[in-house]
Amino acid sequence: GFEGQAPEPIHKNLQPFASLIIESGDIDCGLATDGDADRIGLYNSKGEFVDSHHIILLLINYLVKEKKFTGKVVNAFSVTPRVKKMCEFYGLDYQVVKIGFKHIAGIMLSEDVLLGGEESGGIAIKGHIPERDGIWMGLTIWEYMVKSGKSLDDLIQEVYKIVGEFKFERSDMHLKEEVKVAIVENCKNNNYSSFGPYKVDRVETIDGWKYFFDNGDWLMIRASGTEPVLRNYAESETTEKAFAILKAAEKALLG
């Protein structure tokens, strides 16, 4: 139904959309969703992809700073820990849960939640429904741009003043099931003290393994429960450094 590709609103699936924005020269922001519109993909005026971590931070900054909303922030384990830094800045409670929006929705139904978000682009906010809505998130970002009179890039720079500049990248390793299982066992047994030059400082294991390095960068490894795929996530101060972490991880994991 999607010409043979997964309908995930990420940059590799949205190349024609990015090209359209670049070629037009007069598009301030581009909004994309998946097939049922619960996940959001966002582009700036230069056709550069804005990932879900940045969208979550933008939404929190707008809802608290401009709309004076309150409430807890609940995010999936794969979301950047910089969200915690923003929550501390605004005095908000912060909770990390397992991956899967059902873990967020349950809390939204029973507690006062400002925002719930996933790395996949599924985000819900207060005042709407306790479920992901990519179109509503995009409209909220556009409202932020209109009311502030600022570009998306300018608003992202305001976020960076609070949490610092960062880039996030993800790679999927398609492996034989037995190889995937062996890597998972190594993670369970704490067999990775470093990934190439990146020395592990601490590990979090809420849903998968998130390895933090001494400079604050991190790598997350999580096996898919439905297919022979290992998902690797990395965050650093530049795109190049994030990709370097992913490359070092792949080399270490495959031995």
Positions of predicted regions on the chain:
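Phosphate-binding chemistry for phosphorylated carbohydrates and sugar-nucleotides
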Residues: 1-148, 161
